[in-house]
C-alpha cells in the first residue's frame, strides 16, 4: 500500500474526550472515528487490525472443530420472552417495533436465536455433539459508553454455541474452546491469563474468563504465586480460617462514638486494630418474611456482592437497603450498626466467625460496643464466604498465596447446561428413542475489544507498538527525498515490490513530507519494522532498519534485508 493512495488520518493532538490510552491512540492513529456515543466507524488502518484479529479467531475456531454460521443481528422478541430474558435483561437490551407493531431486539448475544435454530434443525443424537460459531456485530445499550472500543455500544464479537447429550462431550468441547482461546491470544503475542469466573446473567455451571493483562484493566484478578490457579476477584475463594477463635479477654462495654461514622474514623479515634472491627451492611432480603438481611465482614475486608447474591436469604441482584428502611427496622443508621440485638437474619464471613474482643455498632446512633465475643454476647450466625480475597492470603489449591493483577476481559466461556434448552424445549431423541433436553456451552470473544486491549498492553509515548500478528502493516518503507532522488525512488520501489511478492504487508510512504512527519506517523500507527532509504545509505550499500518494539537501529546490507524482514515478520 502506498500512503499517497491510502487514507492515513493521523492526528498530533490527543482528543480531550478520550480517557484511556487505547481510545486516544486509536483516534490519533486514524483507526476509528466516533459517529455517536459508543458508535464508531473503522478507517482503513483500524479495519486492517480488526480483520487480522478476526482471521486468527476464525482459524482457531475451525481448528477446534467449530463450524461457522451467521445469524441476524435483529432478533424477534418472542424468543426472549420464551427464556424469560425479555423481562430480566434490563435497559441494555435495545427493543423496538417494526411497522407491523411486532417487538424485536438488537442482539447483545445469540443464545435464543441459536437454540431456536437447533431445535428446528437437530432431531437425533446422531447429529451431536455440534459446535457452531459466528463473527457478528452485537449491540448493548450501555448507560454510559466509555473508553472507546473497550466499552462501546456496538461491537464485533465471535460467539460459539455447542450442543450435547452428555456431560463428557460438553466437557471435551469446553476444554477445546479453552485451548483455542489460549492459542488465539498466544498467536496475537498478548500476555494474558485465564481465570475462574462467575457465570453472571448468562448462567451455567462452569465459567472461565480470558484477560489481557494491563494496568488499565477494569477487572481485578486474584492468582496464585505457586500454581496456575487464577480467578476473577468476584469468584476467588476466601480461605476458611484454620486457627480456632481466641478466648475472650475483654468485657463487653458500650462506648459513645459521636464522630465515628466509618470504620476508618472509629479506628483512628480509638486507636483500634482494624482487624478487630466489623462492618455491618444491610441488604434487601429475598422474601416478605425477611425483608432485610445483615451481612457482616471484617473491618479491613470488602463485601463481595457476587458471592452475597448467591445467598438464599438475599434478593438478587444484591441491593443495599435504603437508610430510611434501615432506621425504621433497626433504629439506627449506617455507621452505627452491629450484630448485637439485631432482629433480622445475619450472615457473617468466615473471618468474622473466629473473631474475639471485636468492635461493632450498637444499633444506636453514635454508639459502639467494644469487646464483643461470639456465644458470650450473642449467638453465632450463619457463616459464608461473602468477601473479596486480599493479597497474601493462601489460595484454595494450597500451592501459594494470592497476588493481584489488572486485566481486560476479552473472552468468556460457559457451560450453560440446560438453562436455555429447557425453557425453549430444545430436545432430541437419544439412542433409545427417548426425548432428551440438550446440554449447551457458550463461548464468546470480543474481537473489537481485543484490538483495544492489545494497545493497552503495547504502547509508548510515541504511539502503538503492535504485536507482529495483528499489525496493520508489518513493514514501513521511508524513502528520504524520494521525489528528488531517482536512486532512492528506484530502490524503494524495488523493495516495495519484493516485499509484496513475499506476501508481507508493507506501507510505502511516498508523500512529499518532511522526514519527521513520516517517522512520527510510522511510530504512531505502530508498524513493527521500518526501513529508511536515503542517498547516504545507498552510497554505503545499506538500509537503515529500525525495530519499533526495541527501538534498535541497524545498518543492513542490501542483499540481507529481505531475508531479515521475512524472518522477523514470519517469526
From Swiss-Prot:
This is Proline--tRNA ligase. Its EC number is 6.1.1.15. One of its GO terms (biological process) is prolyl-tRNA aminoacylation. It catalyses: tRNA(Pro) + L-proline + ATP = L-prolyl-tRNA(Pro) + AMP + diphosphate. InterPro entries: aa-tRNA-synt_IIb, aa-tRNA-synth_II, aa-tRNA-synth_II/BPL/LPL, Anticodon-bd, Anticodon-bd_dom_sf, Pro-tRNA-ligase_IIa, Pro-tRNA-synth_IIa_bac-type, Pro-tRNA-Synthase_IIa_type1. Consists of three domains: the N-terminal catalytic domain, the editing domain and the C-terminal anticodon-binding domain. GO terms for cellular component: cytosol. PROSITE patterns: AA_TRNA_LIGASE_II. Catalyzes the attachment of proline to tRNA(Pro) in a two-step reaction: proline is first activated by ATP to form Pro-AMP and then transferred to the acceptor end of tRNA(Pro). As ProRS can inadvertently accommodate and process non-cognate amino acids such as alanine and cysteine, to avoid such errors it has two additional distinct editing activities against alanine. One activity is designated as 'pretransfer' editing and involves the tRNA(Pro)-independent hydrolysis of activated Ala-AMP. Homodimer. It comes from the Bacteria. PANTHER family: MITOCHONDRIAL RIBOSOME PROTEIN L39/PROLYL-TRNA LIGASE FAMILY MEMBER, PROLINE--TRNA LIGASE. Belongs to the class-II aminoacyl-tRNA synthetase family. ProS type 1 subfamily. Its main location: cytoplasm. Keywords: Aminoacyl-tRNA synthetase, ATP-binding, Cytoplasm, Ligase, Nucleotide-binding, Protein biosynthesis. The keyword Protein biosynthesis applies. One of its GO terms (molecular function) is proline-tRNA ligase activity. It is found in: Cytoplasm.
Amino acid at each position: 500500500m502506498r500512503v499517497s493512495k491510502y487514507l492515513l488520518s493521523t492526528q498530533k493532538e490527543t482528543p480531550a474526550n478520550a480517557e484511556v490510552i487505547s481510545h486516544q491512540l486509536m483516534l490519533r492513529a486514524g483507526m476509528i472515528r466516533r459517529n455517536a456515543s459508543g458508535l464508531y466507524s473503522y478507517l482503513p488502518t483500524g479495519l486492517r487490525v480488526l480483520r487480522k484479529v478476526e482471521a486468527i479467531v476464525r482459524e482457531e475456531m475451525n481448528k477446534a472443530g467449530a463450524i461457522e454460521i451467521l445469524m441476524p443481528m435483529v432478533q424477534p422478541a418472542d424468543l426472549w420472552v420464551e427464556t424469560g430474558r425479555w423481562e430480566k435483561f434490563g435497559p441494555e437490551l435495545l427493543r423496538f417495533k417494526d411497522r407491523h407493531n411486532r417487538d424485536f431486539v438488537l442482539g447483545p448475544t445469540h443464545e435464543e436465536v441459536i437454540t431456536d435454530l437447533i431445535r428446528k434443525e437437530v432431531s437425533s443424537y446422531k447429529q451431536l455433539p455440534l459446535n457452531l460459531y459466528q463473527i457478528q456485530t452485537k449491540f448493548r445499550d450501555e448507560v454510559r459508553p466509555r473508553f472507546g472500543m473497550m466499552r462501546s455500544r456496538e461491537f464485533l464479537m465471535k460467539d460459539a454455541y455447542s450442543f450435547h447429550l452428555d456431560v463428557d462431550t460438553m466437557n471435551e468441547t469446553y476444554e477445546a474452546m479453552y485451548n483455542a482461546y489460549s492459542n488465539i491470544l498466544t498467536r496475537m503475542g498478548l500476555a494474558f491469563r485465564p481465570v475462574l469466573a462467575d457465570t453472571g446473567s448468562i448462567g451455567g455451571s462452569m465459567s472461565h474468563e480470558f484477560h489481557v493483562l494491563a494496568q488499565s484493566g477494569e477487572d481485578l484478578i486474584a492468582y496464585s504465586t505457586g500454581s496456575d490457579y487464577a480467578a476473577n476477584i468476584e469468584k476467588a475463594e476466601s480461605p476458611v480460617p484454620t486457627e480456632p477463635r481466641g478466648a475472650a479477654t475483654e468485657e463487653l462495654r458500650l462506648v459513645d462514638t459521636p464522630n465515628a461514622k466509618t470504620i476508618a474514623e472509629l479506628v483512628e479515634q480509638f486507636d483500634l486494630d482494624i482487624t478487630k472491627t466489623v462492618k455491618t451492611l444491610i441488604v434487601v432480603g429475598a422474601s416478605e418474611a425477611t425483608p432485610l438481611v445483615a451481612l457482616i465482614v471484617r473491618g479491613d475486608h470488602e463485601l463481595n456482592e457476587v458471592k452475597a447474591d448467591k445467598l438464599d436469604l438475599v434478593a438478587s441482584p444484591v441491593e443495599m437497603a435504603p437508610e430510611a428502611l434501615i432506621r425504621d427496622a433497626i433504629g439506627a443508621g449506617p455507621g452505627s450498626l452491629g450484630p448485637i440485638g439485631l432482629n433480622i437474619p445475619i450472615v457473617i464471613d468466615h473471618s468474622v466467625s473466629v473473631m474475639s474482643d471485636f468492635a461493632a455498632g450498637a444499633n444506636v446512633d453514635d454508639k459502639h460496643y467494644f469487646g464483643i465475643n461470639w456465644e458470650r454476647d450473642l449467638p453465632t450466625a450463619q457463616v459464608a464466604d461473602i468477601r473479596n480475597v486480599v493479597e497474601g492470603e493462601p489460595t484454595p489449591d494450597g500451592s501459594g498465596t494470592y497476588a493481584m493483577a489488572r486485566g481486560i476481559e476479552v473472552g468468556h466461556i460457559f457451560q450453560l447446561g440446560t438453562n436455555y434448552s429447557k425453557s425453549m424445549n430444545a430436545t432430541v431423541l437419544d439412542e433409545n428413542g427417548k426425548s432428551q433436553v440438550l446440554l449447551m456451552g457458550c463461548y464468546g470473544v470480543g474481537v473489537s475489544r481485543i484490538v483495544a486491549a492489545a494497545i493497552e498492553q503495547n504502547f509508548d509515548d510515541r504511539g502503538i507498538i503492535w504485536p507482529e500478528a495483528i499489525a496493520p502493516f508489518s513493514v514501513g518503507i521511508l524513502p528520504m527525498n524520494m521525489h528528488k532522488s531517482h536512486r532512492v525512488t528506484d530502490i524503494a520501489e524495488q523493495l516495495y515490490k519484493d516485499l509484496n511478492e513475499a506476501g508481507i504487508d508493507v506501507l510505502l510512504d511516498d508523500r512529499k513530507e518532511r522526514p519527521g512527519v513520516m517517522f512520527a506517523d510510522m511510530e504512531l500507527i505502530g508498524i513493527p519494522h521500518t526501513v529508511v532509504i536515503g542517498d547516504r545509505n545507498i552510497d554505503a550499500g545499506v538500509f537503515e532498519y529500525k525495530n519499533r518494539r526495541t527501538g534498535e537501529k541497524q545498518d543492513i546490507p542490501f542483499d540481507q534485508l529481505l531475508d531479515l524482514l521475512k524472518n522477523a515478520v514470519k517469526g
